[in-house]
């Protein structure tokens, strides 16, 4: 069984670019997206759609 560190689909946390709050947890495929993920999501603290980047 593979360990969590070398998992193909790890859990990642998405943080708002503007206020730096970590709002979302999702999974990504490391083979398809080796770079850091960036998505447009709703930030409840900013009360608007902002870019959310993957944090480590």
From Swiss-Prot:
Originating organism: Nocardioides sp. (strain ATCC BAA-499 / JS614)
UniProt keyword Ribosomal protein, yes or no: yes
Coiled coil: none
Family: Belongs to the bacterial ribosomal protein bL33 family.
Gene: rpmG
GO molecular-function term, one example from the UniProt record: structural constituent of ribosome
The protein, known as: Large ribosomal subunit protein bL33
GO biological process: translation
InterPro entries to which the protein is assigned, alphabetical: Ribosomal_bL33, Ribosomal_bL33_CS, Ribosomal_bL33_sf, Ribosomal_zn-bd
Any Pfam family the entry gives: Ribosomal_L33
């Amino acid at each position: 069984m593979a360990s969590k560190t070398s998992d193909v689909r790890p859990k990642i946390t998405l943080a708002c670019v503007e206020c730096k709050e970590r709002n979302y947890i999702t999974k990504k495929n490391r083979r398809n997206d080796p770079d850091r993920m960036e998505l447009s999501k709703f930030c409840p603290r900013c009360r608007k759609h902002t870019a959310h980047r993957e944090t480590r």
